[in-house]
Amino acid sequence: MDILQQDIMYLTGVGPHRKEILKKELGISTYSDLLEYYPYKYVDRTKVYLISELGANMPYVQIKGHILSFEEFDMGRRKKRIVAHFTDGHGVCDLVWFNGSQYIYKNYFIEKEYVIFGKPSIYNQRFQFTHPDIDDASELQLNNMGMQPFYNTTEKMKKAGITSHTIEKLTKTLIEKLVEPLPETLPNFITQRLHLISRNDALRKIHYPVSIDDTQRAQVRLKFEELFYVQLNILRYASDQRRKYRGYYFKTIGKQFNWFYTHNLPFELTNAQKRVIKEIRADMGSGKQMNRLLQGDGGSGKTLVALMSMLIAVDNGFQTCLMAPTEILAEQHLQTLKEFLHGMNLRIELLTGIVKGKKRKEVTDGLIDGSIHIVVGTHAIIEDKIQFNNLGLAVIDEQHRFGVAQRAKLWKKNENPPHILVMTATPIPRTLAMTIYGDLDVSVIDELPPGRKPIQTIHKFDTQTTSLYDGIRKQINLGRQVYIVFPLIKESEKIDLKNLESGYEALKEVFPEFKMSKIHGQMKDKEKEAEMKLFVEGQTQILVATTVIEVGVNVPNASVMVILDAQRFGLSQLHQLRGRVGRGAEQSFCILVTNHKLTTETRRRIDIMCNTNDGFEIAEADLKLRGPGDLEGTQQSGIAFDLKIADIARDGQLVQLARDEAKKIIDNDPTCSKSEYNLLWNRLKELRNANINWGAIS
C-alpha cells in the first residue's frame, strides 16, 4: 500500500477523535491530504525579541525567558483566566489562557526557560500573549528555526484543541516519518526546462522552509503542478471530444449571407465583429466541431455576429437554433432576428414553454422536415422529444444559465454534433475563461457599435434623493424609461435593507404621474413576463425590480439605471445591471446609491464602476476581490475550484504557462499512447478518480 494513502488516524498525535475532526472540518483523511494542506502564511522565527522591544501593533514575534509565577482570576460560570507572569530579564509580560488549567500546570514550570511565540497586545498597561505557542528552550535551536508556517483552522477545531500549531506538529511528525523521497509527478523534461524543484523538496520546504526563498520556490512548483493538471484535464477532454465527434464542414458563403450583408446590415460592422466572424467562419470550415465562447458587453453586437454565423449554416443546407435563458429574452431575440432578416425568404420560429397545441406541432414538424431554418427558444429546444432534420449550429445565449450538461444534450440531436457558439455578456477574465471554459475557444468583441455613447456612472448617497428624483423625472419627461433596482425582496432581521414592496409603494407616491411595473424573483414566471412586457413595449415608464433583470432584455429607450443599496452588490453584478441601459443613441446614466457607511472594499468597487465601462477590467478586479468560486457561472462549469494552493486571480502567469505546457503534451500525444508521457497520464487518471468534479467532464 502507498504510505501516502495511509489513514491519518495512525499518525502519532491523531487517533480516532482527531481523525473525525480533521476529516469533517478540513477534508483530511490520509497522509497525502495532510501533506497537501498548505500553510497560508509564514512568520520569520530566526529573530528573538526582548520584551522591552515589543510594540502594540507588532505581528507574531517570539521572546525567550522564564515564568515568574501563576495567577488565576474567576470569570464566573466556572470559567477562569490563568495568567503566567513571564520575564526575560529586560521586562515583564503576561501569558494568558482562558481554559486548560490542568494542562498548563502539568506542563509549564516556574523558573524553567521557554520560547514564547504569539501576537502581543496590551492589557492593563502590560504586554500579554493570549494562548501563545510555548516550546522548551533547551529543545529548540533558534537560529535554525527558519519560517513559522500558519494553517487555517475552524472554530470547532479550536474548541477541540486543534490549532495551527497542532497541524504544524502533525505535519512535522509525518515528514520525519517519510524517510524515502516522495514520488515525482512531473517528468524531468518539464521540471528541468522550467527550473522547478522536485515534488519531494517542494512538499518538505512548503511546510518547513528555512527562508523566504524556500517558500517561494516550493509554492511555484506546487502551484504550477496543480494548474498544469487542471489544464491537461480540460485540454484532453476537448481533444477527446474533437476526435470522437466529426464536425460539419461549412464550405460555402452563399446567397443568404451575401444578401444580408449587402441589403440588410443595419450598420457597419466594428473591427471586433469582423475579426470574430472570421474566427467563427474558420472554425466551421475546418471540418471539426466548433466550440467557441463569444464574450462582449451588453450592446456590443453579439447577436448580429451570431445571426451572420447562422446564415453561414443556412447557406450550407443546415438548420440553426438560438437558446435563451428566459421566455421573454427568447421572444425578444425572435423579434430582433425577424427585423434583421426582413424580406429574406427564411422561416424563423419560436419554441418555448408557452408555444402549445397546434402551433407547437407545426414547429416540431418543421424542425423534423427541415422547413424551419432558424428556431429561437429556451431549454425546451433540448428536450429529448425535439428532433431536427439537420441541426448544424447551436447558439447559446448567457451560458451560465445553462451549464455543461445542457450543452452536451445538443450534441445528441444529430449523428454529428452541431457547431456550438456560446455567448455571454458576463465578462470573464482571461485566466478564468481558460479554466472554466477551457474546452472552448474564446472570441471577444471589445468595441461598441458606432453612435453609442459610454454610460455615465454616478455615485450618490441615500441622503441625496431630491436630486436623484429630479434627474429621473427629467429623463422620463424627455421620453426615456428608467430601471430602479432593489437588492432584496424581504427585509432581513439582521441587515436593514430597503424592501422592494414598500419601496415600490413609496416610489408611486414620488412619481404619481408615471406608470410603473415591478418584477422580483418570487413572482411566477407569467407575472414577470407580463410586467416586463409592459416596460419593453413602453406602456410603463419605470421598472422597479430586483436583480432578475440582469439577464437579457433589450430596451433601447431605457436610459437610466438606478441601483439602490449598491454597496450590497458585487462588481460583476453592478456591471451586468448597468448593461441594461446604453443601448440607444441617447446618453445613458447609471446611478449607484449607497449609505455613508462604506468599507474600503466597497469604496473600491464604487470607484472602479465610476471610472471604467470596460467589462474585462471590472471582471479582473472582481476576481481579485471575490475569488473564482463566487463568480457567476463557475458552479455550472464542471471544473473544480477547490484548488489547494494556486489562485487563479493572482497566478495568471502560471495559469498561462500551465496551459502552454499542457497544450504541448496534447499536441505531441493526442491519443495518450506515447510511453514518455505515461507518468502524466497515470497521474491524471489518479486525479480524475479522486476528484468528482474532474470526472464529471471526463
What are these regions (language model features)?
Residues R275-K278, S286-D607, T671:
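Inter-lobe coupling/hinge segments of SF2-like helicase ATPases
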Residues H263, F267-I277:
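N-terminal pre-Walker A segment at the start of P-loop NTPase domains
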Residues Q128-H131, A137, L393, K409-L410, ...:
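N-terminal cationic and glycine-rich segments that engage phosphates or anionic surfaces
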Residues F73-N264, N668:
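Upstream accessory/linker segments immediately N-terminal to the RecA-like ATPase cores of bacterial MutS
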Residues Y37-L68:
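OB-fold nucleic-acid-binding modules
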Residues M1-T12, E20, K24, V230, ...:
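Long, highly charged, low-complexity intrinsically disordered interaction regions
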Residues E513, M532-I542, I549-P556, M561-L564, ...:
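Accessory helical-bundle/CTD segments and flexible terminal tails appended to RecA-like ATPase motors
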